[in-house]
Amino acid sequence: MSVSAFNRRWAAVILEALTRHGVRHVCIAPGSRSTPLTLAAAENPAFIHHTHFDERGLGHLALGLAKVSQQPVAVIVTSGTAVANLYPALIEAGLTGEKLILLTADRPPELIDCGANQAIRQAGMFASHPSQTLSLPRPTQDIPARWLVSTIDNALAMLHAGALHINCPFAEPLYGDMNDTGLVWQQRLGDWWQDEKPWLREARRLESDKQRDWFFWRQKRGVVVAGRMSAEEGKKVAQWAQTLGWPLIGDVLSQTGQPLPCADLWLGNAKAVTELQQAQIVVQLGSSLTGKRLLQWQATCEPEEYWVIDNIEGRLDPAHHRGRRLVAKIADWLELHPAEKRKPWCVEIPRLVELAWQRVVAQRDTFGEAQLAHRIRDYLPEQGQLFVGNSLVVRLIDALSQLPAGYPVYSNRGASGIDGLLSTAAGVQRASAKSTLAIVGDLSALYDLNALALLRQVSAPFVLIVVNNNGGQIFSLLPTPQSKRERFYLMPQNVHFDHAAAMFNLRYHRPENWEELESALAGAWRTPAATVIELVVNDTDGAQTLQQLLAQVSHL
């Protein structure tokens, strides 16, 4: 009997089972223990293969692929700390709902806790963060193939959102020519190999019941809060709120067109808050809100009813309002709960919005970080997409810009870490094949610098704008101790990214004014390649501009 041959047949069943659940993208890191899984994926024509040498980046690449494709994405890594490097992407997927299938190769049980090389306790190592976990036994013909395939099917059928961790121990030898070992075992699955359906099919209902009193609540004074959602959902939500005559407070990731832009500015005005207190119901569609003032208002508002609608299960309201948590796809929920044409009830807020927008526009000519955030709409590629980093940049865009309705916007706003942002953006581009504008800060770029290797393989124009404000300037907005701020919070690195771009053979520009930036962008959008554009800005100007605007608008 050939151990290596049966390992591969066992792995082939696993990978083929994944294809029956919509898995098309497989992300693979180099490794020896994962050889059976890697070869099974490589030999399956149903897969699109992606490779990367860094498992942390690989996990985020898969996350980006899943964001766009809306299908589960598989990740294959070897044993040991390679597995641990998937943790950040796994956590993010658990909070934002992307489906990741983590296939982690492992040593067999007899090599765990005995000093064997590259052998750690992998089973259960991700604690409660995966939505589902599956620890497979060592491959053996004593276990029928139908058990293996139905076990995979069951786990995937139960996976509504987040990650499925499948730990796969393999004994040596891992290499060798294929022979007939296990062929009969494999063939007992019969014509399943030629079919396209799962061996075990399970139906899972995901739809919220129609709220029978909706006809009553839609006649009241309401507020719509729009969080993270798809581009199509964003357009539908905007139309729905407009028909109802309810003010729509749209997050940067809502893709609603933010009909009341600069919400993070005007929500700091007491007149706006007073008017919003008249709302009898708040309907929040989508989670992961960005703006600080929006979150502060959301935490203190006390409507008669607060509804949260999202297809992710669990509590998504950190303020714990009394109301309803409705698990449903946003578009489906809107169809069940049509709007009734009514006149807008807010009078003061539209006036404040116009005045706040005027204050922002008055600053747009200065070459700086806050002004870039305001202008970002002008730089979006036609028929393309935007990926927004975390920390200060996403807050500035949320507060100072107005993105087009239905324009695809992606970000990692679950755990909101700065790790893996470039890798995620690379995955977003690969899955969509669209022109992509990504914007991150300098520390975020440094954190994921080796992901520039992934940008060598883009299929359409890709522009990475690195806003270099020399450190974590988000902490300039927080009451961090002045005497310790630079060393222990900002951590300026005093670096530029020209050599990093050159190392990966990427085009690079460092514009010093808006005309040079627009010229660099015009050239970048004409070529299906990646371009790094570094904007070197004064360290604290972005944070100071936001604070000044907040002060101005609060006194309108």
Swiss-Prot record:
Example GO BP: menaquinone biosynthetic process
Cofactor mode of binding and number, as noted: Binds 1 thiamine pyrophosphate per subunit.
Domain of life assignment: Bacteria
Cited InterPro entries: MenaQ_synth_MenD, MenD_middle, THDP-binding, Thiamin_PyroP_enz_TPP-bd_dom, TPP_enzyme_TPP-bd
The UniProt record lists the keyword Magnesium: yes
Top EC class of this enzyme: transferase
The protein's Enzyme Commission number: 2.2.1.9
Cofactor: Mg(2+); Mn(2+); thiamine diphosphate
Catalytic activity: isochorismate + 2-oxoglutarate + H(+) = 5-enolpyruvoyl-6-hydroxy-2-succinyl-cyclohex-3-ene-1-carboxylate + CO2
Subunit structure: Homodimer.
Protein family per UniProt: Belongs to the TPP enzyme family. MenD subfamily.
Protein known as: 2-succinyl-5-enolpyruvyl-6-hydroxy-3-cyclohexene-1-carboxylate synthase
Biological source species: Salmonella paratyphi C (strain RKS4594)
